[in-house]
A protein has these predicted regions:
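Charged, low-complexity intrinsically disordered segments
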Residues: 1-146
């Protein structure tokens, strides 16, 4: 019996639940490997070859190579693990988060310092707030997949 997941109706949000955890196990393990300097060096020297050493899906590998964190998350990546990719690339977490929203680092920081996104129009998918897919750089691709 499938679980009722009312949280899937939150726009602009991928909930890292047990299903996402299973789906993203190998992409997250790859990210954890970047904790070691020698693995970061191997990855940067030949990214496709390093990724081929992991039993990730081809979609996960493409998402990593594209540095598309929204795509990585849709394939099961957890943002706290994915942050290691950004760190390997010399990016701050603010830069990474900004890239996920289509904002510059400064725009993202200013939005967060000002209290974050308004909940108005962002409580459920289908409203017209700023977190809705039609207002995001990933567009309708940002919707949760079945």
């Amino acid at each position: 019996m499938a679980l009722d997941k009312p949280y899937l109706d939150v726009p602009g949000t991928i909930i890292f639940d047990a299903e996402q955890s299973r789906k993203g196990y190998w992409i997250n393990q790859f990210c954890m490997s970047l904790m070691k300097a020698e693995n970061r060096e191997k990855f940067k020297a030949n990214e496709p070859a390093y990724l081929d050493g992991w039993p990730m899906t081809e979609e996960q590998k493409l998402a990593v190579l594209a540095r598309d964190l929204n795509w990585c998350m849709r394939t099961g990546g957890n943002i706290y693990f994915l942050a290691k990719i950004g760190a390997t690339d010399g990016k701050s977490f603010q830069q990474m988060a900004g890239s996920m929203t289509g904002m510059t680092e400064d725009e993202y920081r200013n939005m967060m310092v000002s209290g974050g996104r308004s909940v108005e129009g962002n409580r459920y998918i289908g409203e017209d707030g700023t977190a809705q897919a039609q207002h995001q750089p990933q567009g309708s691709a940002g919707k949760a997949s079945a």
